[in-house]
């Protein structure tokens, strides 16, 4: 049998070489000021990531569009580099942290989000990113860096157009409100002053501390909250305290890890009422009810969030302004892309029919 081993190994090695050769095959080339290939491996990696995120297989025509976007991405990256536009790793991390924060609705660092993912799903942040969009964290940050540099390059090229953008008119703001009025429903809300005492290594002491807070709140009421809150900022305080708003919704109950019945009990308490000590997996909590508001559809003059300063009118104005700016940016990117492609700065090596076959995997 020995005489068959070497040919078999050569066959396996040849298959591996063919695969590598296929992945490294240049499908196109970008050359604004530096020759840079667009390989089949890069195209497959990007399209696989997009298909994973979209949850479906793309058609050959759609894959061609995303291949073209990869060419544009490399053109923009070279154009930004040539123009001296730089994006630091610190800036990329800031954008990345902002995106992570949006996912869980509060400000978090990369390390905090990694702990959150580990706790909830028992996977690493790298694995989480791979599941979400098919890219590792390093790959996604590189992609994000290119996106930021592209936006800055386009903003520089189209500075005059962006400066002359007009915001939404009053009639547009009011029309948007009328058409979307039901979306501005605010459920019954309750404002609590909440105290959390982490169990740490001494759960008995933590519970005793929470019970002391309950006594203090029942004795002095709202007057006690200022002192409790100010002392919570100390490094050795051993607890946190502050105001929170809760909406009477199933989403709120889920976010807090409460049953709907438990949430309704909170809403059944009157203003000034103090809770007993409640135990969770990580801490002991207690609270006093500060304020209650009935459900309503917000008017344009209402505040979007209680205790904040932004009215619904300003909120809609800002929203429409962002939409105008986003559309202007997308239009500008298309225009600059067309300008970059005019000068023979890229080349696709395969004819349409052959390219269609390559993209049909």
UniProtKB/Swiss-Prot annotation:
Instruction: State the signal peptide span.
Output: 1-20
Q: Does the keyword Heme apply?
A: no
Q: Where in the cell is it found?
A: Cell membrane
A single GO CC term, please?
plasma membrane
Source organism's superkingdom? Bacteria
Matching entries from InterPro entries are given as: PPIase_dom_sf (IPR046357), PPIase_PpiC (IPR000297), PrsA_foldase (IPR050245), Trigger_fact/SurA_dom_sf (IPR027304)
Keyword hit for Nucleotide-binding: no
- Which UniProt keywords are listed? Cell membrane, Membrane, Signal
- What GO annotations for molecular function exist for this entry? peptidyl-prolyl cis-trans isomerase activity
Just give the chief location class.
membrane
Q: What is this protein called?
A: Basic membrane protein
